[in-house]
């Protein structure tokens, strides 16, 4: 689960790092920072063991697209889906640092009891005085295991171990009582009361 959250945050961070440069190039090309710009998204290979759904919210374009990267995934994961929706870009803020924050919430009542929703929000500022805010939320659905299965080797091993310990205890008790036991002496004729 933590691996999926890290993968989602890493993919979101890669997109955040690519967005300011792309927005700055579009702004300088068209001359207006308030116009509608199309921002290309990064595609990356994701190696996770659970289903991950990421949503990137953006108000810059009204077009919603789905990117399914072709990647090497384990057999129990089908794909990672990235849906960009809105990105807020404003020019007044200038800051040379990145502020990441992550929060983890419990699943809603409509979700399955094993699903976990993780959301992260990251704000960064590029050198061109553009403020970019991207919100990434990931939902993981762990696959069900095969459950417990009878292991004959462990069963036989447990029986052998138990019998071995019992036999050692039995032999130890026999030796202890044989050394400590009552010593009988033979009755001689002169000691016998007749």
UniProtKB/Swiss-Prot annotation:
Membrane topology: Single-pass type I membrane protein
Parts of the chain on the Extracellular side: 25-151
Signal peptide: 1-24
Annotated region described as Disordered, given as residue ranges: 88-124
Protein name (record): Porimin
Transmembrane segments: 152-172
A Pfam family recorded for this sequence: MGC-24
Record function comment: Implicated in oncotic cell death, characterized by cell swelling, organelle swelling, vacuolization and increased membrane permeability.
Record field: compositional bias (Low complexity): 99-124
Keyword Membrane: yes
């Amino acid at each position: 689960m933590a691996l999926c959250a890290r993968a989602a945050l890493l993919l979101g961070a890669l997109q955040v790092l690519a967005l300011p440069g792309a927005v700055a190039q579009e702004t300088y090309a068209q001359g207006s920072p308030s116009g509608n710009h199309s921002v290309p998204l990064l595609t990356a290979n994701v190696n996770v063991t659970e289903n991950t759904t990421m949503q990137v919210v953006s108000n810059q374009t009204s077009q919603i697209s789905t990117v399914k990267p072709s990647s090497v995934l384990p057999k129990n994961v089908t794909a990672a889906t990235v849906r960009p929706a809105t990105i807020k870009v404003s020019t007044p803020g200038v800051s040379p640092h990145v502020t990441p924050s992550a929060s983890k919430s419990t699943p809603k009542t409509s979700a399955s009891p094993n699903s976990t929703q993780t959301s992260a929000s990251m704000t960064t500022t590029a050198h061109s005085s553009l403020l970019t805010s991207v919100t990434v939320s990931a939902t993981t659905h762990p696959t069900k295991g095969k459950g417990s299965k009878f292991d004959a080797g462990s069963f036989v091993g447990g029986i052998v171990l138990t019998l071995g310990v019992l036999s050692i205890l039995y032999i130890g008790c026999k030796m202890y009582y044989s050394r400590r036991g009552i010593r009988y002496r033979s009755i001689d004729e002169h000691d016998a009361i007749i």
